[in-house]
Swiss-Prot record:
This is PqqA binding protein. Pfam families: PqqD (PF05402). Keywords: PQQ biosynthesis. Pathway: Cofactor biosynthesis; pyrroloquinoline quinone biosynthesis. GO terms for molecular function: quinone binding. One of its GO terms (biological process) is pyrroloquinoline quinone biosynthetic process. Belongs to the PqqD family. Monomer. Interacts with PqqE. The gene is pqqD. Functions as a PqqA binding protein and presents PqqA to PqqE, in the pyrroloquinoline quinone (PQQ) biosynthetic pathway.
């Protein structure tokens, strides 16, 4: 996805019934939902950990850029995560 300021102005929040947490048995962060669980990779877990219903996508990207200043494709990675999570109904974008 190409950088889209309108898209990045949206605020992600976990869809009702979905919860992000660390799952010790999986030794990973997961998204829990009524029908099961999705194990996240490290990158997705970093992004998911910043979804709080208050930060915009742009703010999440800025926060991650502070932690990882030498990753130029980070913004595109966040955009792709948000698009995929929205399509799978993990998150709502408001």
């Amino acid at each position: 996805m190409k950088h889209d300021p309108q898209f990045r102005a949206l605020t992600p929040k976990w869809h009702q019934g979905y919860r992000f947490q660390y799952e010790p048995a999986q030794k990973a962060h997961v998204v829990l939902y009524p029908e099961g669980m999705i194990k996240l990779n490290e990158s997705a877990a970093l992004i998911g950990g910043l979804i709080d219903g208050k930060r915009t996508i742009a703010a999440i990207i800025d926060e991650l850029h502070q932690q990882f200043p030498n990753v130029p494709e980070l913004g595109m990675d966040v955009d792709e995560f948000m698009e995929g999570a929205k399509k799978k109904n993990w998150i709502d974008l408001v």
